[in-house]
């Protein structure tokens, strides 16, 4: 490894190639605006939970080309004035973003980058890499939390995560989505997350006996959660846990037992009965074993007696949808006269047509009910709070419309960097979690459903929509050589 290694080259080669084109053509400092967004709700959910901003900030603050970066690029064939430009690179971007914990929706900008064209191009890959992963994990955690409600969710996925960075930042994202704590000690240290550890089957196997293993553990640790399913949960494991808890008395804090296999719905009811009959009515039952929101929902339908949920593989890997699919598109570019020109990306797939222009997303909230009525996308500089009513309509199915009055409009995109200088103070992680929960409570129940949620409105202001339609027509006419279809 290089002692001066940086994350600046955490990018795709074609970003560097395009930077070189812009530089050689003398347009690298033209002002540009790019916006990141995703096209479909993850997990067929009604919302997504935005995460990743802290790492984006850390990445951008340290954006520079080190000596070893320059040497490596030179080995790839880059040379001359372009390398000199990279040596003197100074981050000058203006960045606006949703806040971590914000609920975000398909086809609205969640990160907006403005500044020199070449710099905007460089950061695409890293920004998407961060947002695509962390938003996915935060959303998965929020789905699980929506099912278990006030019961604790513990993140147990480190060993199944896609490498160490994914484990650390995935844990943090899971906490934003609602996890109460983690088994990951390093994540606990870095982000001040509560940590919880029980023990593995190996401890019982080493002693060859549940009672001896639990007794040894209790003599070492005051807070005890015993894993009771190594050999036989109901006939060996739970009785041994009860015996040790009785013998140790006040010398330990008997928190409960963990079940990691078998018919959890049936076994948990029997374990609850055994603990209650032994007088340990306050002892909790912890469950793990490839759980996710769907399994937990099923267990709850069977009235399983679980108090704490340990979720690992299917949370930290976003098991049922491994990619969010966020994209990063240019929406405006400075022309030769110094004026900003809106740009659009067309496609035969309607969902892949981008929205042109630098925009702002407004969360429209009913003053009477305190609930979110939808998101309204305007051009930047418009203050929706100056309006007395908003006519919202679906950007594709325009006959779906409604008029909203007596509302508050809250801008989603806030200033993070201005001309390369950080202007946003990063909040503490648990404050972000509390904020996410507050935002979740503003959603109507129809949008919160884990299964078949209602579609949350994300609508364009009429002028934005009309300009989009006009640009589509212009580009189609250009493709046809000016002929009418």
Task: Cite the ranges covered by each PLM segment.
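Gly/Ser/Thr/Ala-enriched C-terminal appendages of enzymes
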Residues: 1-30, 44-45, 291-485
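Short, positively charged
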Residues: 75-83, 163, 389-397
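A residue-level signal for beta-strand positions that form part of recognition/binding surfaces
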Residues: 33-35, 92, 153, 327, ...
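Buried, small/hydrophobic-residue-enriched core segments of structured protein domains
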Residues: 1-31, 40-42, 77, 83-92, ...
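Short coil/turn segments at secondary-structure boundaries
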Residues: 71-72, 139-143, 157, 448-455
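N-terminal, Lys/Arg-enriched amphipathic/low-complexity engagement segments
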Residues: 30-88
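Short amphipathic alpha-helical segments
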Residues: 52-53, 136, 428-432
């Amino acid at each position: 490894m290089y002692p001066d290694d940086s994350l600046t080259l955490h990018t795709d080669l074609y970003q560097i190639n395009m930077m070189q084109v812009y530089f050689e053509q003398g347009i690298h400092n033209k002002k540009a605006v790019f916006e990141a967004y995703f096209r479909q709700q993850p997990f067929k959910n009604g919302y997504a939970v935005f995460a990743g901003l802290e790492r984006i900030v850390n990445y951008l603050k340290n954006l520079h080309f080190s000596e070893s970066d320059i040497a490596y690029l030179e080995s790839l064939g880059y040379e001359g004035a372009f390398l000199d430009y990279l040596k003197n690179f100074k981050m000058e971007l203006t960045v606006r973003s949703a806040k971590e914990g914000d609920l975000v929706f398909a086809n609205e900008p969640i990160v907006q980058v403005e500044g020199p064209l070449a710099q905007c191009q460089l950061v695409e890959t890293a920004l998407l890499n961060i947002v695509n992963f962390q938003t996915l994990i935060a959303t998965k955690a929020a789905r699980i939390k929506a099912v278990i409600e006030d019961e604790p969710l513990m993140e147990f996925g480190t060993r199944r995560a896609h490498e160490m960075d994914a484990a650390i930042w995935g844990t943090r994202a899971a906490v934003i989505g609602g996890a109460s704590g983690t088994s990951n000690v390093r994540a606990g240290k870095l982000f001040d997350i509560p940590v919880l550890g029980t023990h593995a089957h190996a401890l019982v196997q080493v002693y060859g006996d549940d009672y001896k293993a639990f007794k040894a553990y209790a003599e070492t640790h005051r807070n005890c959660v015993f894993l009771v399913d190594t050999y036989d949960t109901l006939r060996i494991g739970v009785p041994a846990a009860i015996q040790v808890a009785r013998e140790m008395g006040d010398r330990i804090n008997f928190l409960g037992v963990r079940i990691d296999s078998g018919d959890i719905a049936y076994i948990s009811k029997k374990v609850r009965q055994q603990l209650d009959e032994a007088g340990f009515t306050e002892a909790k039952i912890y469950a793990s074993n490839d759980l996710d929101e769907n399994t937990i929902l099923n267990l709850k339908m069977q009235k399983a007696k679980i108090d704490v949920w340990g979720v690992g593989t299917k949370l930290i890997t976003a098991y049922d949808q491994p990619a969010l699919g966020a994209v990063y598109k240019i929406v405006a570019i400075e022309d030769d006269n110094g004026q900003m020109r809106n740009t659009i990306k067309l496609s035969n797939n309607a969902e892949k047509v981008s929205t042109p222009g630098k925009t702002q997303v407004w969360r429209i909230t009913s003053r009477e009910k305190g609930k979110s009525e939808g998101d309204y996308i305007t051009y930047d500089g418009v203050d929706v709070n100056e309006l007395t009513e908003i006519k919202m309509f679906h950007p594709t199915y325009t006959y779906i419309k409604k008029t909203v009055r007596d509302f508050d409009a809250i801008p989603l995109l806030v200033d993070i960097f201005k001309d390369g200088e950080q202007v946003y103070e990063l909040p503490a992680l648990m404050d972000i979690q509390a904020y996410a929960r507050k935002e979740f409570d503003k959603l109507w129940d129809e949008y919160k459903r884990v299964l078949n949620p209602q579609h949350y409105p994300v609508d364009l202001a009429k002028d934005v929509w009309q300009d989009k339609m006009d640009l589509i027509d212009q580009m189609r006419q250009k493709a046809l050589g000016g002929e009418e279809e």
